[in-house]
Amino acid sequence: MPFHFSPINFIHYYLKREATQFFTSIAIRYLGLGMVLIFEPIYIYLYFGRSIPLTLLFIGSIHGLFALLVVFGGKLISKIGLRHAMLFSNFFIFGYYLSLFFINISIFFVPLAILLKSIGFTLFWPAFHIDFARFSKKDHRGLQVGKLNIAVLIPTIFSPIIGGAVLAVFGYSVLFTIVLIILLISAIPLFLSKDHQELYTDSYHKAWGRMFKKINFRNDLALISNSLELSINAYLWPLFMFVMAIGYGTIGGIISFSLAITAIFSFYAGKIADSAFRSRLLKTGSVLTSISWVMKYFVLTPFDAFLTHALYRISRTLAGIPFSSTFYDIAAAKKEEADEFIIYREIIHNISRMFFLFLLAGVFLVFPKINSFFLVAAVLSLGLMFLGDQTKPDKK
């Protein structure tokens, strides 16, 4: 009997598994977001007349509002389910980029953009972390975090180059339109998913009070360090390259080639993170990440930027995979309280980022040298190790 290959049947078979649906949706999402994320701070920077303080105040406001809304988000996620929350978040992110598209028409779109992105984050990130903590298995969590990294990295290897090319030829309006379409497509796999309900029980006071518990002190330090270091990479590093007069296409190329190198390490770092060497891997990655930030301080040319960012991405992967694996281990060990722990993480992650970005905005008024803050990131990178000593996998 002849074999008939049906693309529709193949896609249906491929998307039957819950993890596959999750990873596919994330991969498509980052294909779109990867086109614009690296250029987004630059767009906002140009809108505010090349003012770094105003740019940081705008971004910090998003994270601050996210921190204030996330407890309500946890209760809403309890009602609509994890997958539906991630699905609905796309429409708010869609609205955010639409607001950026029209931001030059009226200043009204500035607060609207802040509100829409905050709501989008509130629906997506807690649901994302809870879902991953639930379906990933303890014995293979490092490997699954590595696979998640690859699901994010593979599309984002190409998307910054594509985004940079679109931006250089057609401008931001066409780029935002493409991103909006891809975001909507990324929701399709979630329609195929069996949803999961969580019961989030923390009051507003109890959720915020978790930050001040003595038992969470080391977690606090690790999560704050992680958040602030990522902020410098996400917001100041792109601005630094732009101020250096590196073109959009070159910036996209630097990010893409660095991510390509990183993808090679993600799978192996994930396997090591499932062994008794997780803590050692985290410490090694944290130290190397710190060194890479010191090297970024001395960047003068696009080639320097490529080399140092490639080292950073490799080092950050070596630190980030065991860090995330440990975080998900702690969350999963909480069982019914996993969602409460993750909401606590979102509060401390974003409120610390808001205060940090607001502080930087003030500092930039009197000390506008961007690369000086790369040395701050070098110190913050070492703070990731505070999480590494708390949960170690059993030796096998």
Predicted features along the sequence, with ranges:
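Intracellular juxtamembrane helix-capping segments at the cytosolic ends
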Residues: L123-K137, T317-K335
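Structural signature of the two symmetry-related core transmembrane helices
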Residues: H84-S99, L180, R280-M295
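Conserved MFS/SLC helix-loop-helix module at the cytosolic interface between two early adjacent transmembrane helices
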Residues: L68-N104
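Helix-loop boundary and gating motifs at the non-cytosolic
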Residues: F3-A67, K213-S256, Y312, F373-F374
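Helix-to-loop junctions at the C-terminal end of transmembrane segments
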Residues: L69-L82, L167, I264-R278
